[in-house]
Amino acid sequence: DSIDNEPWRYAVQIDYYRRLAAGELGFQLVYEGKVEPGLFGLRLNDRPADESFTVYDHPHVRIYKKVDSLSAAEIHERLLWGASQPWYPMRNAPNKTLMLGVPASETPTSNDANWNSVAISNTPFAIVVWLLAIELLGLAVAPIAATAFRASPDRGAFSARMIGLLMVGWLVWIGASLNWWPARTLVVSIITITVAACAWGWYVLRKRSGRPIELPSVRVWLAALGIWGTGFAFFLMLRAIYPDFWQTWFGGEKPFELAYLRAIARSTEFPPYDPWYSGGIINYYYYGWHLVATVTRLTGLGVSLGFQLAVATIPALLILQIVGLTTTITSSWRQRRPRPTVIIAAVTSVVAVSIIGNLDALAQIISMRGLPRTGFDFWRSTRVIDFTINEFPYFTAIWADLHPHMIDLPVIMLVLTLVSGLVLAPPRDRQTVIVVFSLLALALGTAAVTNSWDAPLCAGTILAGGIWAGARVGGRPGITIIVGAIAAIFAAWIMFLPFFSGFYSVVGDISRTATGSPLGEFLVVWGIFFLVVLVVVIADAVILGRRRTGWRDALVAGIACLAGGTAAFAFAVVRGGTVPLSAFVALWLAAGIISAGSAGAAPLRLGRVITIVSVVAAIGIGAIASHRPAAVIALSFALVAAWYAIQTRPARALPWILVGLGCLAIAGVEFVFISDDLSGGDWQRMNTVFKFYNQAWLLLGAGSALLLAHLWSRSRTLPAGDIDHRSAANKDITLVPHPRTAMRSAVVRRSACVVGAVAIVTGLLYPTFGTTARLAQDMPSSPQFLTLDGYAWMNGGTIQNATGDTIEFDGDLKAIEWLNANARGNPVILEASIGPYRGNGSRISSATGLPTVLGWDRHQRQQRYPAGIDRRMSDVHTVYNDTSLPSKLEMLRRYDVRYVIVGDVERYWNSADNPAPYASAAGLDAFNALVGNGLTVAFESGHTRVYEVTPFARLAPAPGAVHIR
């Protein structure tokens, strides 16, 4: 049994014993004797135990009798799979093999994610079931969420659903990863009930002990349901209008996501098998799909329907989590009428983060000289900066790719909400500390294994928030909080150690960017948020900077920035270079931003150290204008945000911190990028910009919206009521403003609010015109009625290849339905590997979850070693074109293929560069020649035929051969 633990070393031996036990080598089992330890009638499988215990104490004995004599060629054919596995003659594998160690067909799977046939056949009922499942997950952990957000007026009602999903999902995953229990529907149900019992049992104990947990009111819970339910209904309606899982040019990566989601939903152990690299494990950030699969298992709605519902659920939960963040922060503001401010802040934040787009929509309308009826390019707005991706949450929602970066958006917002609550109301009792930091560890770990790009932001936020909260409390309780924050980061790694221990990252080192973003394109992406922040700063500068010292501070800071830029420009010219016009524009903009911030925040009156640091920072920012003009703007806003944050109360500092973090994120990618498989080309920083811009949109959107709401709330307050200057600290001072001063301040602030609101409303141009443009991109065969059937377009769906031949998909759809209904276990299929996007390649494995020899090679290169991918790509093409029957069958045996797909994609797909069809006519005819001699026709419909590789004959054990006691 020990050789099973080293498949890289004993692949052939393992395959031999596996075939022997299956009766495929001509030997019949005539006797099997073993003793299984037991207690109270329960048997314990001790096979994984050390051999010194099993072999020498109670060996497992098998006796085989030779019945059939196989030739050397027949034995060779049976052991082809083992002989083709990567072999390393060492005790330890030199690298992570990323392989299962057994054929994919023998991995344990379950098809219990579609147990609810009644709901699957009734879409309205299925929607209700899904909604109830999300609510159930939230209610299960309501006492835990209420403890974590005990100081927030919502008492965790806005975060409970995410917390419940994360808790249940992790418990299912960790058990399946450590082989404690399988990932199945029954286990998900038991864990959900257990979590609810523990949470509510704890609630009862706390109540009896005189320390009750204050739960959210029914009204607040229903309000949360209404918020996320409304968002869910809106985004689900978009999916019902445009349900297609694939489209020739604008289909996205849904086939990839569906394949992996199906494989995860079918896997009972983790890591799951790779559906696009048979015999391999998924070496990708699959955990977000596991969370979706958890709800799919719980509801029994199946992956196809679950995918559509999840695509609507994620942005809806993001909206709810944004409301949770704004409620947590704004409820701590000191104001006379808190409720209107909370509502305005929540609505503004939701719109700014989840609904609006960037300024490219306005640019398109201006270029069209009027409101467009047709021709609006919704895609262009996400590719503003050349060779990068500049997506934002609304595009992500209507694009409807269930990708890791999408799934992780509400997780990031949950971390920000938890940290905000930690800072504003630091926990002091031990139980609350444990709850808060346990949830932070869970959320951080989830972010790391869902979309690792988000982990640094989440970890840094937790650490900084813990230090800040600890400093506010002081003493031993403060130290406990700081230690808790550090422990949460380590706990996150330990909680997900099974994932990291088997994961191999193809992402390389941090590299320096050759060039930054053009200033104009950069401002198109971020101009809305920058303008909102700028009007807030200018309002303060106008009101507070009217003092002589305010304008003097502004002059000093602005001159420092200009001095740094001028020196850098001169140095560039001396070295023979040129200074682009954008650098001058960026320098003067930065000087203006810094001057206004200095007048409003008055950092130069906070002591000598702050003054020196501020001046040096202003000089440094100006100095980089010559070669990174975009970074200059972002860093200027970051500096101003820092000035405000260090001298205001935590509740008012948090929006500035969000803005500052967002600006640092987008400034950082102007200097460095993470090396990946795109390194060395024009697109080398594509993923870095893409991922960090996603985070920055959340931070800047929420931060700027909160600043605007706060500005509105101050329209009736004292001019200086928002800044806690050191000179007035710890003094009980009541200031009565002059009526004229108060009126002037109110006018300035309200005018600034109008400008900021107009900026945000401008962003609504994108959803107004981009939504209809996106919905118009469905396949011509897509149903003209509302449906969530993502494969309905295949019924009558066709495309043209490069030479004008028609590729039909009717037969493929029937083959998919047949395989889903009749394929048992986890058989390997063979279909054309034609790369991503255009030709609907790998459509059968995507729609069934069955492992194929090779799916989209481009995505596999992001996950595993290239040599195996190249070999498989060549082998798959060879199988479809080879006319030698023995070699054709040998290749199928080598990859343990059970079903061979021959449809129009295999028959006709080609490209302009290579007009020859993917499979030659002679190669396809050879499959027919093998029928009856290694193949059978298992299914046929239209132009699609499914061949089944004839399995090897098996000898069943002799009657009465097995003896177990």
Label the predicted regions:
Residues 483-493, 560-562, 608-617, 711-771:
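Signature aromatic-anchored transmembrane alpha helix within multi-pass, membrane-resident enzymes
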Residues 124, 216-221, 230-414, 793-806, ...:
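Active-site lumenal/periplasmic loops and adjacent helix-entry segments of GT-C-fold
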Residues 32, 39-53, 58, 71-218, ...:
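Membrane-embedded, hydrophobic transmembrane alpha-helices
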Residues 1-107, 766-965:
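Extracytoplasmic
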Residues 426-444, 475-487, 549-564, 604-617, ...:
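Short hydrophobic alpha-helices at membrane interfaces in multi-pass membrane enzymes
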Residues 312-315, 458, 683-710:
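Hydrophobic/aromatic-rich transmembrane helices and adjacent perimembrane loops
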Residues 136, 185-239, 336-350, 434, ...:
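Start-transfer (signal-anchor) and selected internal transmembrane alpha helices
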Residues 396-399, 437-450, 617-622:
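Membrane-interface alpha helices of multi-pass inner-membrane proteins
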